[in-house]
Amino acid sequence: MSTATTTSTPAQNVDLSKHPSGIIPTLQNIVSTVNMATELDLKAIALGARNAEYNPKRFAAVIMRIREPKTTALIFKSGKMVCTGAKSEDASRFAARKYARIIQKLDFPARFTDFKIQNIVGSCDVKFPIKLELLHNAHTSFTNYEPEIFPGLIYKMIQPKVVLLIFVSGKIVLTGAKVREEIYEAFENIYPVLSAFKKVNAITQ
């Protein structure tokens, strides 16, 4: 899992009407899908393309990588493709187009249809420790907290439909969004809750 990175953007650079907390979550990963609308010979693609691997006994797709944008694609026989690793929606689309062009250059009549963002992952750091057990007790219908299995509290927000992983350190991971605004909205929704369960003394839970 990616470690949460930059969040403490100076307040004067943040539009407080959109980000009242003064914190803007960083986008860490975009997962997108596209349909190339043609059946593919995966063995031929793996042999013809650079940075491609295909082991059908392990996984029924070609795994292909490009450096710019730094992404990985899963390319299936049906012509469906999953692109992961981009840091923005535009970069994800650009990378998916690059993969489609590689397939075209290998003489497959690949098209670029039904491009969709399936998941956006963001992260941030509120810069204060959080009383996870008390937060869980107060929001049991939305949360799952089993520290012996996973150190973070899982918070399933209903609106927007985003899942948050909340760690005692104040690091937050947000996943499940289809558009970046849902990441921002989910964080602004949770920020007052996190503030209410801020650890005043790091020794006490």
Curated annotation (Swiss-Prot):
GO cellular component: nucleus; transcription factor TFIIIB complex
Pfam families listed in its UniProt record: TBP
Sequence repeat start-end pairs: 27-103, 117-194
Compartment(s) of residence: Nucleus
Entry GO MF terms: DNA binding; RNA polymerase II general transcription initiation factor activity
Top-level taxon of origin: Eukaryota
Keywords: DNA-binding, Nucleus, Repeat, Transcription
Gene3D superfamilies: TATA-Binding Protein
Biological processes annotated in GO: DNA-templated transcription initiation; transcription by RNA polymerase II; transcription by RNA polymerase III; transcription initiation at RNA polymerase III promoter
InterPro entries assigned: TBP, TBP_CS, TBP_dom_sf, TBP_eukaryotic
Subunit structure: Belongs to the TFIID complex together with the TBP-associated factors (TAFs). Binds DNA as monomer.
Function: General transcription factor that functions at the core of the DNA-binding multiprotein factor TFIID. Binding of TFIID to the TATA box is the initial transcriptional step of the pre-initiation complex (PIC), playing a role in the activation of eukaryotic genes transcribed by RNA polymerase II.
Protein name as annotated: TATA-box-binding protein
Source species of the chain: Dictyostelium discoideum (Social amoeba)
Name of the gene: tbpA
